[in-house]
A protein has these predicted regions:
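Membrane-interface helix-loop junction between the first two transmembrane segments
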Residues: 19-44, 388
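Polytopic alpha-helical membrane-helix bundles and their juxtamembrane interface segments
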Residues: 360-588
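Alpha-helical transmembrane segments of multi-pass membrane proteins
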Residues: 16-27, 57, 372-380
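Cytosolic/stromal cytosol-facing helical appendages immediately following the last transmembrane segment
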Residues: 126, 177-315
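Membrane-embedded catalytic scaffold of the fatty acid hydroxylase/desaturase
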Residues: 51-63, 83-240
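Alpha-helical bilayer-embedded segments of polytopic membrane proteins, i.e.
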Residues: 3-21, 42-66, 89-98, 137-168, ...
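Transmembrane alpha-helix boundary signature
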Residues: 59-79, 102-110, 380-383, 403-412, ...
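Transmembrane alpha-helical segments that form the membrane-embedded catalytic/substrate-channel core
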Residues: 15-24, 95-110, 165-180, 191-197, ...
Length: 588
């Protein structure tokens, strides 16, 4: 049985214990003897990051085990499997693993690039059992290095995998505020009290108590601290987001930005290996960060209505079911199939977080769900599922647009053009599901682009930036020549040529509108129009020139991104833009 399947079997136990902890906290809060440590958005975010970590481990886990096995095969000094599979061998391997884990964990707090991976586990400002499941998706990229001593010593890969899972599962129960000090146990083992210290941002607790199972490593190496004052949780640079993708990327992005901006070549490297918080002097001078003050710490709790919270909980439950099914069968799936479902589940988790932040409406989340399922089913050839979700995605987006633009201040022509473009696209989606209706489908999308040209011309006129028109027509001409020489049938050369001209004009109109308006919303619409060109280019290449791997994945992903960027961000002419782009002209 694989680790992923063991995690699946352990999931009901995890949720049972989370439920018990939640009820205990609520009761203690009512009695005045404790407090409730759970907030629904934070819990969904932590559990969602746990799901993302597990489903991505289907890919990254191969790296970790593969490199370990290769090293063991080549360099093992004592590869006696009989010894290592006796009780004393298992125990020695577990202690050995825990020692290696201590140093990985410690360097994860003392080296910025390793902190970039580990920070995910510390971002929650609450401390409960859901925090235990909040794990990184990038830790395996470098973490395997710290376990190579086990491979060289001769610990077999199977034994390594089992003790790694035991060490990980042990750490689940220590993430709670509902269990106090445990006397002698605290002196030898990682316990709730010891691990609360590790998660705290108090000055006296920073970079302490790294042990996974045994706390004696911290006592031996001088990093132990007892819990002697209330803990404040989170990180000193709070995430302030429910976005699981950004949670994994935020520190990498900050390091890359500082590395890019510093002028000294040595600092471009040092920023990655120095302790977290270290910054090149020249970067810190132009972009200083305020000193941490624990008295200023505020919990991130954006307002979300009860209905949105209920929807997010239901959405998460469905994503959890999908992730469980994926983990159970992942060992039998081809790599491409795993990548497709990983992308679909990630899209759903991202959309759930965005809804809880108020960045997406429920309708937009439903569109993303339908689009993800349409894309996945199309890429994997699941015809019946694709036949349902491909038209459903655009139908949901039409409903969203009707609701968003029905206000009296929205001009009727603006709304009609947007809806016309979406309805024509829906008709094209349906027709293109049958190869014999390619030309009628092409005509529907041509009409959609004409509607979008009229929509984007509102308030700015036709083609306000001739250079943009020249560029998109040039790109279209190159693509058309590529199709022509690649085998475009003679009967399709005129309709496809006409379509290329119209979609290029649509993209040029969107780009020109963005240049005139100068706001982020119009820029997103322009990106959407460009995605439309990319999607259709991929579709035509796959149909007429050469077969692309999992073509439907790339075609539909860019197509749905295009439609959402247009429908969600296009604005009537004259509407005030609160997200005006900064003026990039030089100042005097």
């Amino acid at each position: 049985m694989r680790p992923g399947q063991i995690i699946v079997l352990a999931t009901p136990v995890f949720f049972l214990l989370i439920g018990i902890e939640f009820l205990v906290g609520r009761r203690r809060a009512k009695l005045g003897t404790g407090h409730d440590t759970y907030r629904l958005p934070d819990t969904i975010n932590s559990l969602g990051l746990g799901i993302l970590s597990q489903i991505s481990a289907v890919l990254t886990g191969l790296l970790r085990i593969g490199l370990y096995t290769a090293c063991w095969s080549a360099f093992a000094l004592f590869p006696n499997e009989h010894f290592w599979t006796q009780w004393h061998g298992w125990l020695l391997a577990l202690v050995f693993y825990d020692l290696c884990y201590y140093w990985l964990h410690r360097f994860g707090h003392e080296s910025a690039v390793l902190w970039a991976a580990h920070v995910v586990h510390h971002q929650s400002q609450h401390y409960n059992l859901s925090t235990a499941l909040r794990q990184t998706s990038s830790g395996a990229l470098l973490g395997w290095i710290f376990y190579l001593p086990m491979a060289i010593a001769g610990v077999p890969p199977l034994v390594f995998g089992v003790v790694a899972l035991v060490d990980l599962l042990y750490q689940f129960w220590v993430h709670t505020e509902q269990v106090g000090r445990l006397g002698w146990f605290d002196r030898w083992f990682c316990s709730p009290s010891n691990h609360r210290v590790h998660h705290a941002v108090n000055d006296r607790y920073i970079d302490r108590n790294y042990g996974g199972v045994l706390i004696v490593w911290d006592r031996l190496f001088g990093t132990f601290k007892e819990e002697d004052e209330p803990c404040v949780y989170g990180t000193r640079s709070p995430l302030r987001s429910w976005d699981p993708i950004w949670a994994n990327a935020e520190v990498y992005w900050a390091l890359a930005r500082d590395s890019w901006r510093t002028r000294r070549w040595s600092d471009k490297l040092r920023v990655w290996i120095k302790p977290p918080g270290w910054r090149p002097a020249d970067v810190a001078a132009i972009d200083p960060k305020p000193a941490f003050d624990i008295r200023q710490v505020q919990r991130y709790e954006p307002q979300a209505s009860g209905s949105v919270r209920a929807f997010a909980a239901a959405q998460f439950a469905l994503l959890l079911a999908g992730a469980i099914a994926f983990l159970w069968f992942s060992d039998t799936l081809p790599l491409a199939t795993s990548l497709v479902w990983l992308a679909a589940l990630t899209a759903g988790l991202w959309a759930t977080g965005a809804a809880l932040q108020g960045r997406l409406t429920v309708a937009e989340v439903l569109f993303i769900d339908a689009a993800a399922l349409a894309t996945a089913s199309g890429a994997l050839g699941i015809g019946q599922l694709h036949g349902v979700f491909k038209p459903l995605a655009l139908a949901v987006l039409i409903g969203f647009a009707l609701t968003r633009h029905r206000a009296p201040e929205v001009p009727g022509r603006f709304a009609r053009l947007l809806i016309a473009g979406l309805v024509a696209s829906l008709a094209g989606d349906v027709l293109l599901m049958w190869p014999q209706f390619f030309v009628p489908g092409l005509v529907c999308f041509l009409l959609a682009h004409l509607a979008y040209i009229g929509l984007f011309a509102q308030g700015v006129g036709l083609f306000p930036r001739p250079n943009a028109l020249a560029a998109t027509l040039g790109i279209g001409a190159v693509m058309y020549a590529f199709l022509w020489w690649g085998g475009l049938p003679g009967g399709l050369r005129i309709p496809v040529g006409l379509y290329v001209v119209v979609i290029a004009c649509m993209a040029a109109q969107a780009i020109g509108r963005a240049a005139v308006a100068g706001d982020r919303a119009s820029l997103k619409v322009a990106v959407g129009a460009s995605f439309f060109m990319l999607s259709d280019s991929l579709l035509a290449t796959n149909r007429f020139v050469l077969t692309l791997p999992v073509a439907s994945l790339w075609v539909l992903a860019t197509y749905y991104a295009a439609q959402w960027l247009i429908a969600a961000h296009v604005r009537p002419a004259g509407e005030a833009a609160a997200d005006q782009l900064p003026n990039m002209s030089p100042s005097r």
